[in-house]
Amino acid sequence: LCPRDWLLRGDKCYWLSKGPNNWNWSRDDCWGKRSRLLMLQSQEELDFIQNVTQDGKNVWIGLKVTPPGGKWTWVDGSPLDPARFPVSGSVDGNSCGCIRGRRIESQKCSGSFRWICQKEAAV
């Protein structure tokens, strides 16, 4: 089961924000909902999210460039597998990940986009 206004898919619940904000705000908002920014597991999940967002605009996910070394890292601290999910766009110390259509893009973390939270569905 998922809370009201959340979408169920498999064993996960997803929530898409109505309005935009920056990446840090988005991350904290998900935490406040006892969830985290979306961490993609598969191409099928990306396709599902694309169907949910529909308009093709940028949507924040739980991906950020972390120093040192400037590697893409998910919000749980695990590294991104670039072979599975390549990221397009420039990368610097202030880069965060978003979904646009069927791909992941790098954007400045201060950019204002909608975001997606995810959590485990209650059994």
Per-region residue spans from a language model:
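Extracellular, disulfide-bonded carbohydrate-recognition/adhesion ectodomains
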Residues: 1-123
